[in-house]
């Protein structure tokens, strides 16, 4: 019960923090005047809190292309229209959350499988793999996204077969390629971390004792070493999710994907921005709390 109350307090503090950050410009700017305006700032905060309590009344602005032909010239203009927040926001919200958690699961699975496999290899081969992975970690995320898009398009042009969808549209959203791209950097970081922890665990006395008992290296690694390693890895879950969120913002821009972050960055009403931020952050915060609970159970 105490932890539940603490979690609710954290969520309330998040809401207050988001609200103050979103309303901060009104503290210094009033129309075209620049100064220090406390009253409009507090009024904006009160309006945001009031609007959040009535989500059915929230409206979001969406820009749509409108085709016009003035003077026999075809012109496409962007026209902004207001729509109710629900159910319009549900599809981009589910898409972004699905990418985050899909990439998280993929990165954990790939890191676990690759680290166990690499730990079983001879030392010379393991050193080569670790060096190659260290080089991959220096590759910027934007470059990797462009490279994957160009690779998919090049394969399609040469063999006339579209392996993965390189561009996301509202009618045909790209799923597999974004998950692979988003999981790239977290997989490498987890892989390096797990290899380091495995090497440290292999120096422990219980590993020497298990080898003396005649247990195989695979059995010792999976049954004893990895159980201790996974507990330490759970301490880095927040970092992994933070990397995924920042990469998701870059991905939505480069893939022209209509996700929740692109909506937040498109200049919505302050109350809508705060509500969408909470809608996006709370599930991620819930996963962090769940993994912390699992870690405590493992220690117990």
Name these PLM-found stretches.
Residues 85-117, 233-239:
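Transmembrane alpha-helix signature in integral membrane proteins
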Residues 214-215:
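Glycine/proline-centered hinge or cleavage motifs at structural transition points of membrane proteins
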Residues 9-17, 218-248:
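Transmembrane alpha-helices
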Residues 178-186, 255-297:
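Hydrophobic alpha-helical transmembrane segments of polytopic membrane proteins
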Residues 103-134, 146, 248:
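Transmembrane-helix boundary motif in ABC transporter permease subunits
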Residues 168-211:
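Membrane-cytosol interface at the C-terminal ends of specific transmembrane alpha-helices
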Residues 130-185:
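Generic hydrophobic transmembrane alpha-helix motif, especially the helices
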Residues 23-32, 235-265:
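Non-cytoplasmic
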């Amino acid at each position: 019960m105490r932890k539940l109350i603490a979690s609710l307090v954290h969520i309330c503090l998040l809401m207050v923090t988001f609200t103050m950050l979103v309303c901060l410009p009104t503290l210094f700017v009033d129309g075209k005047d620049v100064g220090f305006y406390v009253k409009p700032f507090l009024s904006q905060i009160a309006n945001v809190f009031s609007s959040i309590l009535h989500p059915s009344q929230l409206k979001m602005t969406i820009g749509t292309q409108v085709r016009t032909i003035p003077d026999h010239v075809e012109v496409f203009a962007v026209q902004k229209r207001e729509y109710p927040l629900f159910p319009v926001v549900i599809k981009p919200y589910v898409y972004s959350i699905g990418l985050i958690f899909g990439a998280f699961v993929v990165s954990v699975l790939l890191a676990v499988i690759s680290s166990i496999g690499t730990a079983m290899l001879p030392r010379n081969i393991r050193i080569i793999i670790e060096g190659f992975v260290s080089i991959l970690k220096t590759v910027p995320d934007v470059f990797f996204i462009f490279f994957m898009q160009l690779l998919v398009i090049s394969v399609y042009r040469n063999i006339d077969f579209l392996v993965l969808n390189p561009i996301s549209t509202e009618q045909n959203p790209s799923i597999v390629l974004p998950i692979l791209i988003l999981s790239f950097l977290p997989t490498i970081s987890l892989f390096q971390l797990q290899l380091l922890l495995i090497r440290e665990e292999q120096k422990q006395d219980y590993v020497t004792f298990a080898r003396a008992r005649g247990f195989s290296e695979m059995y010792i690694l999976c049954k004893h070493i990895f159980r201790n390693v996974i507990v330490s890895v759970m301490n880095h879950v927040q970092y992994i999710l933070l990397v995924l969120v920042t990469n998701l913002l870059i991905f939505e821009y480069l893939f022209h994907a209509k996700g929740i972050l692109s909506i937040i960055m498109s200049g919505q009403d302050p109350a809508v921005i705060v509500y969408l931020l909470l809608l996006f952050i709370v599930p991620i915060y819930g996963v962090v709390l769940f993994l912390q609970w699992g870690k405590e159970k493992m220690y117990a």
